[in-house]
């Protein structure tokens, strides 16, 4: 099996954060459609498990910020979660927008030949299991597709679960700081990318990642000066909320 770091990089440079940043309710199909309207072909989303192991999209552990529900999303069965309103918090135009499953989003992406970055966002306490289940489902859904989704996580245990379950799927280590051993961790997980808070990239860190055969991605880049700096550094991917500002053709 060819190591991921040695394979060609198939993904676009520009990635729409949570579908379309703040232009639509995050992590919904409405957001993906909005991002696509602005020309984006790759999307980032957050995936976690319901109590009955359905993979669905949501960033927070709790429901109250982005739905009309309450409590911890991972404590509820999908039948309950599927009835929630995930759009009204954003604006009246999106009232009634449901939480999507990973399968819903995958269907949209595959049908339109879009690319997906799935951030594994586990409910605390089930990091490894979430990585396993997300990877297993992604491997099944994309088994006949030329380009699989990129699986990323801040949680090393989630990436370990994904690695064990579907080692052929590409992985990226998410970082909000460069603690000791960060690059060795990415290597041990056989990652193809390191996804950093954009301010962490320097000529030295970019070179270290590239020399290790991995790509450098950045989150969440919403200012033009930051995007220009990252392009000058030679980074490989930019995750942004501002799909209305940055042209994905740039």
PLM features: residue spans?
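Phosphate-group recognition and catalysis centered on beta-loop-alpha active-site segments
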Residues: 1-250
């Amino acid at each position: 099996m060819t190591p991921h770091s040695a394979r060609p990089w198939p993904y676009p440079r520009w990635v729409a954060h949570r579908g379309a940043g703040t232009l639509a309710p995050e992590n919904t199909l409405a957001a993906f459609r909005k991002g696509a309207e602005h020309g984006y072909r790759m999307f980032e989303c957050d995936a976690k498990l319901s109590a009955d192991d359905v993979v669905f999209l949501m960033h927070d552990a709790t429901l109250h910020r982005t739905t009309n529900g309450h409590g911890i999303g991972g404590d509820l069965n999908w039948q309950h979660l599927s009835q929630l309103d995930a759009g009204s918090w954003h604006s009246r135009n999106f009232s009634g927008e449901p939480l999507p499953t990973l399968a819903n989003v995958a269907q949209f992406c595959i049908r339109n030949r879009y690319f997906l970055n799935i951030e594994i966002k586990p409910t605390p306490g089930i990091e490894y299991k979430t990585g396993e289940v997300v990877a297993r489902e992604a491997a099944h859904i994309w088994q006949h597709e030329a380009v699989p989704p990129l699986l990323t996580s801040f949680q090393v245990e989630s990436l370990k679960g994904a690695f064990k379950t579907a080692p052929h799927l590409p992985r990226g280590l998410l970082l909000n700081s460069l603690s000791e051993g960060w690059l060795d961790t990415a290597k041990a997980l056989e990652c193809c990318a390191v996804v950093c808070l954009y301010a962490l990239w320097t000529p030295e860190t970019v070179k270290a990642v590239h020399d290790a055969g991995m790509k450098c991605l950045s989150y969440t880049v919403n200012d033009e000066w930051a995007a220009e700096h990252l392009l000058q550094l030679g980074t490989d991917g930019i995750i942004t909320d501002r799909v209305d500002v940055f042209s994905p053709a740039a």
